[in-house]
């Protein structure tokens, strides 16, 4: 199960003051932001796949250039930051169940942190983005 499914199950079944958690304003705001982050990250993931899969022929080799790498790394940087934030908020909502290894939220959070460090980390992604968007040559 992924983050959305675990969080949906938790806020739909747990109650606080005779109301399910998802009906409280504070929790609804947090889970609404998490749902938006998940949706935006999914769309950007498809966009990155489409950018990286451009070909000059239907079955030719992908066209990879510095511009493509810069755009994909920029998307990776943004999406991994939003995912870490979403997992942190979800662990806050889940309370003591958030870091519990039986719920797998903590494992997914660790995996996202590894993805954040993958391909050189945040600074390298920012330098690639600056190189692409602002034509920096000395970075």
Report the location of each language-model feature.
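Alpha-helical interface subdomain recognition
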Residues: 1-139
């Amino acid at each position: 199960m992924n983050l959305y499914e675990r969080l949906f199950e938790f806020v739909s079944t747990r109650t606080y003051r005779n109301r399910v958690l998802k009906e409280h304003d504070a929790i609804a705001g947090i889970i609404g932001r998490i749902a938006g982050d998940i949706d935006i990250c999914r769309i950007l993931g498809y966009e990155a796949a489409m950018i990286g899969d451009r070909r000059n022929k239907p079955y030719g080799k992908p066209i990879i250039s510095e511009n493509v790498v810069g755009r994909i790394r920029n998307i990776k940087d943004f999406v991994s930051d939003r995912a870490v934030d979403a997992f942190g908020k979800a662990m806050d909502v889940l309370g003591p169940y958030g870091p519990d290894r039986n719920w797998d939220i903590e494992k997914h959070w660790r995996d996202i942190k590894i993805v954040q460090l993958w391909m050189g980390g945040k600074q390298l992604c920012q330098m690639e983005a600056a190189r692409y968007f602002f034509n920096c040559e000395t970075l």
